[in-house]
UniProtKB/Swiss-Prot annotation:
This is Small ribosomal subunit protein uS4. PROSITE patterns: RIBOSOMAL_S4, S4. Keywords: Ribonucleoprotein, Ribosomal protein, RNA-binding, rRNA-binding. It comes from Campylobacter concisus (strain 13826). Belongs to the universal ribosomal protein uS4 family. InterPro entries: Ribosomal_uS4, Ribosomal_uS4_bac-type, Ribosomal_uS4_CS, Ribosomal_uS4_N, S4_RNA-bd, S4_RNA-bd_sf. The lineage of its organism: Bacteria, Pseudomonadati, Campylobacterota, Epsilonproteobacteria, Campylobacterales.
Length: 208
């Protein structure tokens, strides 16, 4: 399945949760989900009872759409998490959090992961002093992630930094906002990552 490129607010209403896909509207409390917290369509307000498989599938979709990954990428990450020692679900979330586009978003250089992905692919981001244009690039603890010199006055990046200053920055990155760089200090603990996803259902789905 390819990466979702359709109307993001309709997707959030269908899944019933905010996926942080609309930055400024979400921060301003103007998202479609807040105004109409039910699925789109004629019968949207009457949510059908969901099966166990449907629940497992929904949790996978929420994670995929939130982090902006394809089915192939997601399955590959799950397989890697399953091979490692530890809690597979927590390790999956950790691997998703290490994606470069997500780290750019977490550092506050973009209001959404979608915009962060664009910044990466268009060459606006450096990792340890080198330009990296692959959104799925894995950022290792201790890495320096910065906005390229030519892009530091980009109005969208400046606006994003101003907006995310209202919401704060996660504990596993240190950011110098004025200089527009940050350090990915460590991998987060699962309980630190606040996302509306119950990854145990994803583990159940892929374990069948």
């Amino acid at each position: 399945m390819a990466r979702y490129t359709g109307p993001v607010e309709k997707l959030e209403r269908r899944l019933g949760v905010s996926l942080a896909l609309k930055g400024e509207r979400r921060l301003a409390g103007k998202s479609a989900l807040e105004k109409r917290p039910y699925a789109p369509g004629q019968h949207g307000q009457r949510r059908a009872k969901i099966s166990e498989y449907g629940l497992q599938l929904r949790e996978k979709q929420k994670a995929k759409f939130m982090y902006g990954v394809s089915e192939k990428q997601f399955r590959r990450l799950f397989q890697e998490a399953a091979r490692r020692e530890g809690n597979t679900g927590a390790l999956l979330v950790q691997l998703l959090e290490q994606r470069l586009d997500n780290v750019v978003y977490r550092m506050g250089f973009a209001t959404t992961r979608r915009f962060a992905r664009q910044l990466v692919t268009h060459g606006h981001i450096l990792v340890n002093g080198k330009r990296v244009d692959i959104p799925s690039y894995r950022v290792e603890p201790g890495s320096k992630v910065e906005v390229a010199e030519k892009s530091k006055n980009n109005p969208q990046i400046v606006r994003a930094i101003d907006l995310t200053a209202q919401t704060g920055i996660v504990a596993w990155v240190d950011v110098e906002k004025e200089k527009k760089f940050g350090i990915f200090t460590r991998n987060p603990e699962r309980e630190e990552v606040i996302i509306p996803v119950e990854e145990r259902f994803i583990v159940e789905l892929y374990s069948k």
